[in-house]
Amino acid sequence: MELHDLGEILLVNDSYNANPESMTAALRTLALLSQERGGNSWAFIGKMHELGVDSELFHKQIGKLAGELGIDHLVSIGVPEYIEGIEGTNTSGHLFADIQSATQILNRLSGADVVLVKASRAEGLEEIAERIISIWSVPGAGGVER
């Protein structure tokens, strides 16, 4: 897990490995960091690989946990089960088919927000983390993509 303090935005990049236990720990960390900073919490999460026949259930449970923890925005890349899990909660769900589509929502990030990027390595979500770093590490960028 890598922390990148980009001034206004805090990025938690854990895009290299994901299983139910590490996803749970990462979401709990996101919730705590967001409470400390006072901004919105954003979870950009992708598929957890090698879960076997219960894969859909595990993904839905992670979505449910995000809702229970009060994560503000759950951005799912290609996994509708995460969005199913947040039904009935105050968490806003955003489902995108691929990474490129998901980057469209980055312009909604704002000061004091905490962003988690997490998935199994094969999903390539480090691209989202790199995009966030490139946008927010420019002094005075304020989240405006250049």
For the regions a language model picked out, list residue spans one by one.
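ATP-dependent carboxylate-amine ligase
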Residues: 2-146
